[in-house]
């Protein structure tokens, strides 16, 4: 969307390896990075995804929220998450100019990996918390099967209702614990 730009940071491309290779760098900063950085000197900051996450590291949701809000130290800060509206804010150009551009999912983020007959397989392995899971589950109205694993100790919840999938398969080290908390 932005000519001569690159995606770097927590997305998997180290910032320091790519610095000054493009005119614009779109940097995904994790809460860990926001906590460690001394001073934020970003032209634009977008605050997204404040949901109970990494509480085991930050100690509390309040501390996690405080760290995530550091993005507001950018010259311009917004909570807008629609990529087309963001493009309009950043470039100061009308968002209608990009309405027909097809945006693709990032790897492992509700990524469509295979379509066979009437089955579509999506990889959402980056969805490591309930908020991300809820987002993914709301992306389709078609019948689907959910394959789920995770660490219930990373996020505190008593019970989690999943509506939508025709079947739910739970696997992994914590399968028994998760199956006791998830109902379908």
Language model features with spans:
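Walker A (P-loop) phosphate-binding motif
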Residues: 1-8
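Flexible active-site lid/hinge loop adjacent to a nucleotide/diphosphate
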Residues: 21-81
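C-terminal helical cap/extension that packs against the catalytic core
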Residues: 152-184
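Short, polar loop motifs at secondary-structure junctions
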Residues: 10-13, 29-33, 78-83, 172-177
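Short, conserved loop/helix-junction motifs that constitute active-site signature segments
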Residues: 38-41, 71-76, 139-141, 159-166, ...
């Amino acid at each position: 969307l932005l000519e001569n730009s690159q995606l770097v940071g927590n997305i998997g491309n180290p910032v320091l390896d790519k610095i000054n290779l493009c005119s614009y760098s779109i940097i995904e900063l994790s809460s860990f990075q926001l906590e460690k950085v001394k001073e934020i000197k970003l032209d634009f900051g977008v605050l997204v995804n404040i949901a109970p996450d990494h509480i085991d590291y930050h100690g509390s949701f309040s501390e996690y929220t405080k760290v995530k809000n550091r993005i507001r130290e950018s010259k311009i800060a917004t909570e807008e998450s629609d990529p087309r509206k963001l493009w309009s804010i950043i470039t100061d150009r009308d968002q209608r100019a990009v309405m027909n551009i097809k945006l693709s999912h990032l790897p492992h983020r509700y990524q469509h990996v295979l379509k066979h007959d009437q089955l579509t397989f999506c990889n959402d392995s980056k969805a490591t918390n309930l908020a991300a899971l809820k987002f993914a589950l709301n992306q389709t109205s078609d019948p689907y099967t959910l394959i789920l694993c995770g660490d219930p100790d990373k996020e505190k919840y008593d019970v989690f209702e999943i509506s939508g999938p025709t079947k739910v398969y739970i696997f992994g080290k914590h399968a028994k614990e998760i199956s006791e908390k998830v109902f379908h």
